[in-house]
């Protein structure tokens, strides 16, 4: 799925117009301080383009966290983002305490030329996602008439619509698909992300290696299935490797992650790999722990020895890392989605860190390396490798759905050209 037939910001006339722009400012916070501003920085080129080309105003809307339709300004306000944005843009940002309604509409109706406005969290209204919880935590659904009113109010805030929220492109939420304006364009971040993935999936450099980690096989079935039609090699690591090893090698896995649902299709996936000539690399040794805890006792195990009862594998061992390094060394293009160990804890981070080092090395020799958002992007931030790989996606779920071969609703909703 590419943007080739969709309107993009560089082709949009913004002069004298009010631009309403969906961005992804869902940034990690600690005590109301932003801990990683990657997503805010990523939206700056689109915002600057509008201002440099004479837009009357740029009204920015985003979600933050999961307030589930309940206003929680103490916990999930976008106000700290306004200050961060001001320093990145070098100009004032007007923060509004809501995202819809008469007061917001008035503030956005006729602002001074070149005004930047940031709306409060879209998800303080249940109409953004269409469902949520009430103040007591009971599940609620938004009424269709109220969803229509919410979307109509958002549509009054601009003359043209730009969507630069790649991280939310896989969600059919009101701000993504429900703004009703004659021109709806993809922003520069959206364009960059889709171009990278389109090229990677439609005309890859070969050998093409996918590195797939993470916990559950069932969550990654479609991903593995779709990628088996595209790649030459695949590393299957992380927690989901144990399901494969138990089914294929009858390995004793102790209390390691095991996915009953996923286990049923392991053999089908392996026979598809064989049919397509895809070389699969699984881990052969492990760093184990006596409980799921940062300070657990640690041990070592191999596929042959098995993992003793009551113990679990939380990282791959050095032999596995060597095998992974060989696969990376053969590749001319790599897509990596999911860590191969519990990288958040020092004792179980070595496998993912050594793999990251190899991917950085591969990049420096000209291999195209794409990091598919989410936890793997967090690894790049943690080890400072964001500018040492070809592309770090800003969207975990969105990049996953692209790699699964799905159409993204947020892209689908843009104007055709």
UniProtKB/Swiss-Prot annotation:
Residues bearing the modification N-acetylserine: 2
Entry binding sites for ATP: 215, 220, 239, 313, 344, 375-376
Binding site for Mg(2+): 215, 218-219, 375
Residues where N6-malonyllysine is found: 131
Protein name (record): Phosphoglycerate kinase 1
A GO MF term: protein serine/threonine kinase activity
Signal sequence bounds: none
Tissue distribution: Testis, lung, brain, skeletal muscle, liver, intestine, and kidney (at protein level).
Residues involved in ADP binding: 214, 238, 343
Reactions the enzyme catalyzes: (2R)-3-phosphoglycerate + ATP = (2R)-3-phospho-glyceroyl phosphate + ADP; L-seryl-[protein] + ATP = O-phospho-L-seryl-[protein] + ADP + H(+)
Modified residues (N6-succinyllysine): 6, 48, 191
Primary gene name: Pgk1
Positions of modified residues (N6-(2-hydroxyisobutyryl)lysine): 97, 216, 220, 323
Annotated GO biological process: canonical glycolysis; cellular response to hypoxia; epithelial cell differentiation; gluconeogenesis; glyceraldehyde-3-phosphate biosynthetic process; glycolytic process; negative regulation of acetyl-CoA biosynthetic process from pyruvate; negative regulation of angiogenesis
Alphabetized HAMAP family for the sequence: Phosphoglyc_kinase
CDD domains for the chain: Phosphoglycerate_kinase (cd00318)
Broad EC category: transferase
Phosphoserine: residues bearing it: 2, 4, 203
Region (Mitochondrial targeting region exposed following cis-trans isomerization by PIN1 and recognized by the TOM complex for mitochondrial translocation of the protein): 38-43
Keyword annotations of the record: Acetylation, ATP-binding, Cytoplasm, Glycolysis, Hydroxylation, Kinase, Magnesium, Metal-binding, Mitochondrion, Nucleotide-binding, Phosphoprotein, Transferase
UniProt source species: Mus musculus (Mouse)
Role according to the record: Catalyzes one of the two ATP producing reactions in the glycolytic pathway via the reversible conversion of 1,3-diphosphoglycerate to 3-phosphoglycerate. Both L- and D- forms of purine and pyrimidine nucleotides can be used as substrates, but the activity is much lower on pyrimidines. In addition to its role as a glycolytic enzyme, it seems that PGK-1 acts as a polymerase alpha cofactor protein (primer recognition protein).
One GO cellular component term: cytoplasm
